[in-house]
Amino acid sequence: MRKPDSKIVLLGDMNVGKTSLLQRYMERRFPDTVSTVGGAFYLKQWRSYNISIWDTAGREQFHGLGSMYCRGAAAIILTYDVNHRQSLVELEDRFLGLTDTASKDCLFAIVGNKVDLTEEGALAGQEKEECSPNMDAGDRVSPRAPKQVQLEDAVALYKKILKYKMLDEQDVPAAEQMCFETSAKTGYNVDLLFETLFDLVVPMILQQRAERPSHTVDISSHKPPKRTRSGCCA
């Protein structure tokens, strides 16, 4: 297996849908409830580069492993459930500190999952289904509760992270570009999330390669040793 050129890590509390997001993107399916033990990863080829995507466990007993998985990460996806405000709070309280081992120019995406369970998500789904002439009245999407976390809350957290990392907003992608609402169940915005990050990570790969010291020897500047009268090299 070829060594990954870069690494992306998903962090977040248990049951926010990290594994489902990753499997929706990589396997194009929505899995039954699966709890990740420790960590698991996929390898994604993007253009000519290999990017590893790590899924981490949200359970408290595996919390310490997150720092290990984040080591050297080029991007971190901080995931919460739009229906549970505490899951957003946990990102700052429990998970942000784990990112200290990531690369110094690490990118952060704030992702609110399970938007399909909200009032807005239900209405969007209902509009699509009403286009079907075979849809019975009893099959309509039932009303859902309003979101507990708004996109503006995610933007506020993103700006807090920049302060925590002592980063200037002008030197990083805008909050509006890095805050997403997704549904692993329907696939809403899942491709957009991952592919936005891939496109942002590729220039970082190129920069790292350019900064690596060259191991090539310039033989054109190499001069042969001078010989002494005894015939030995000086």
Curated annotation (Swiss-Prot):
A molecular function GO annotation: GTP binding
Catalytic activity, reaction form: GTP + H2O = GDP + phosphate + H(+)
Tissues and organs where the protein is expressed, per its UniProt entry: Low or absent expression in normal pancreas and stronger expression in 15 of 18 exocrine pancreatic adenocarcinomas (at protein level).
Pfam families in the record: Ras
Documented activity regulation: Regulated by guanine nucleotide exchange factors (GEFs) which promote the exchange of bound GDP for free GTP. Regulated by GTPase activating proteins (GAPs) which increase the GTP hydrolysis activity. Inhibited by GDP dissociation inhibitors (GDIs).
Annotated GTP binding sites: G17, K18, T19, D32, T36, G58, N113, K114, D116, A184, K185
One GO CC annotation: intracellular membrane-bounded organelle
Cofactor: Mg(2+)
EC numbers, comma separated: 3.6.5.2
Family: Belongs to the small GTPase superfamily. Rab family.
Membrane topology qualifier: Lipid-anchor
Protein name: Ras-related protein Rab-20
Record remark on domains: Switch 1, switch 2 and the interswitch regions are characteristic of Rab GTPases and mediate the interactions with Rab downstream effectors. The switch regions undergo conformational changes upon nucleotide binding which drive interaction with specific sets of effector proteins, with most effectors only binding to GTP-bound Rab.
Region entry Disordered, spans: 125-144, 212-234
Motif mapping: Switch 1: 28-41
Function comment: The small GTPases Rab are key regulators of intracellular membrane trafficking, from the formation of transport vesicles to their fusion with membranes. Rabs cycle between an inactive GDP-bound form and an active GTP-bound form that is able to recruit to membranes different sets of downstream effectors directly responsible for vesicle formation, movement, tethering and fusion. RAB20 plays a role in apical endocytosis/recycling. Plays a role in the maturation and acidification of phagosomes that engulf pathogens, such as S.aureus and M.tuberculosis.
Top-level division of the source organism's lineage: Eukaryota
This protein's record includes keyword Metal-binding: yes
Enzyme class, broadest EC rank: hydrolase
Covalent lipid adducts (S-geranylgeranyl cysteine), residues: C232, C233
Recorded name of the encoding gene: RAB20
Record's keyword terms, sorted: Cytoplasmic vesicle, Golgi apparatus, GTP-binding, Hydrolase, Lipoprotein, Magnesium, Membrane, Metal-binding, Nucleotide-binding, Prenylation, Protein transport, Transport
Biased composition (Basic and acidic residues): 126-142
Organism: Homo sapiens (Human)
Binding site for Mg(2+): T19, T36, D55
Motif placement: Switch 2: 55-72
Compartments where located: Golgi apparatus; Cytoplasmic vesicle, Phagosome; Cytoplasmic vesicle, Phagosome membrane
Listed GO biological process terms: cellular response to type II interferon; endocytosis; intracellular protein transport; phagosome acidification; phagosome-lysosome fusion
